[in-house]
Amino acid sequence: MFRGASAINLDTKGRVAIPKRYREPLHVEYNSQLVITVDIQSACLLLYPLDEWSKIEAKLLLLSDTLPAERAMKRMLLGYAHECELDGNGRLLLPLPLRQYANLGKRAMLVGQLNKFELWDETAWQHQIEQSRETIQDEEFAENIRLADFSL
C-alpha cells in the first residue's frame, strides 16, 4: 500500500527516482513493473503496479466502443498507458506525451493513493491541495452518504 507525498525531481532525460521506501515493495511484490497513464479528471499521471493495472484493464474490456463516454475513457486511459520498469537506480523514464499532459516541470510530487501513485507538477499539487480543502468545507461533502460514517 502506498501512502504519503514525496517531493521528487525530473532529470533532463525525463526520469524520476522513486523514493527508496517504495522501491523494495515495488521490486518484491510487483517485480518493478509499472504502468503509467493519465488521470482523466486532473492534470496528473497515475502510476499503477502492473498487477493493479491488470484489474483496470479487465474493467475497461467491459466498456463499449460504441458509447461515446465509454470509448473516450478507454481512449484516454489506454492511449496514454505506458508499461515500464524501474531501472537499477529506482528510476522511471516518463515519455514526453505523459510529461506534457501533466505539465511536469523539474519539481514534482509523488502521492501514494493505496494501490497506485499520483504524479503531479509541484505547483499543480499545491493548487490541488487548496481545492481539496475547499471541497471538504463544502456542504455537499457533509451530505455525502458514503462519508457519513467515516471517522478518523
Curated annotation (Swiss-Prot):
Q: Which InterPro entries does this one have?
A: MraZ, MraZ_C, MraZ_dom, MraZ_N, MraZ_sf, SpoVT-AbrB_dom, SpoVT-AbrB_sf
| Presence of the UniProt keyword DNA-binding in the record | yes
Q: Where do the SpoVT-AbrB domain residues begin and end? A: 5-52, 81-124
Q: Does the keyword Transcription regulation apply?
A: yes
Name the Pfam families for this protein: MraZ
| Signal peptide residues on this chain, from the entry's feature table | none
Chief location = cytoplasm
A single Gene Ontology biological process assigned to it is: negative regulation of DNA-templated transcription initiation
The GO terms this record gives for MF are: DNA-binding transcription factor activity; transcription cis-regulatory region binding
Family note: Belongs to the MraZ family.
Q: What is this protein called?
A: Transcriptional regulator MraZ
Originating species: Shewanella woodyi (strain ATCC 51908 / MS32)
Q: What is the lineage of its organism?
A: Bacteria, Pseudomonadati, Pseudomonadota, Gammaproteobacteria, Alteromonadales
List the gene name: mraZ
